[in-house]
């Protein structure tokens, strides 16, 4: 994997076939011990990596309703580290939100896609400072102020994710996503 452009991997197999045991002993532990500059990121749908995470001081991120851990979807990357071709991080966030809402809502119209793009730009213009990044809560406030009926329909449709019971991505990030070892636990 060290010779590849990306060291990412996916392990597939039937239930009980030893996938987690193989990965823990053959990939995770050796990487953490032998390569101190490498990062290990695990998406853990069955809560099988919590023990090894605690043993190695991982940043544990619980992705579930009611979780105390939050990830701000509007966080921007470190602009100094962006490649020259990545010169529109706000446009990238608008595209992320378009894709997210298209996947979780039953329908997003072409007009609403345009509104998402506009609202994202306006949200950063109004709220972004050197010390503050807006959240989906502010994004939702800007959305509700838009004049179009489609914007009001969209505001109602996304309210659960911005101010309701599924607002895990609508708060300021309170976990270290730059930590060397991060486990995203999807089961809790």
In which residue ranges do the predicted regions lie?
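P-loop NTPase motor domains
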Residues: 1, 47-59, 65-67, 72-188
């Amino acid at each position: 994997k060290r010779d590849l452009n990306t060291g990412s991997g996916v392990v597939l197999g039937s239930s009980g076939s030893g996938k987690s045991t193989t990965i823990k002993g053959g990939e995770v532990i050796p990487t953490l011990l032998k390569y101190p500059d490498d990062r290990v990121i695990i998406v853990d749908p069955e809560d099988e990596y919590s023990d090894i995470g605690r043993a190695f001081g991982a940043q544990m991120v619980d992705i579930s309703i009611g979780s105390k851990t939050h990830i701000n979807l509007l966080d921007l990357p470190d602009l100094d580290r962006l490649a020259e071709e990545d010169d529109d991080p706000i446009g990238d966030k608008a595209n992320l939100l378009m894709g997210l809402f298209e996947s979780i809502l039953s329908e997003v119209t072409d007009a609403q896609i345009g509104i998402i793009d506009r609202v994202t730009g306006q949200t950063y213009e109004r709220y972004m400072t050197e010390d503050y990044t807006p959240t989906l809560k502010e994004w939702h406030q800007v959305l509700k102020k838009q004049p179009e009926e489609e914007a009001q329909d969209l505001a109602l449709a996304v309210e659960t994710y911005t101010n309701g019971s599924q607002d895990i991505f609508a708060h300021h990030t309170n976990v270290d996503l730059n930590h060397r070892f991060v486990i995203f636990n999807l089961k809790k």
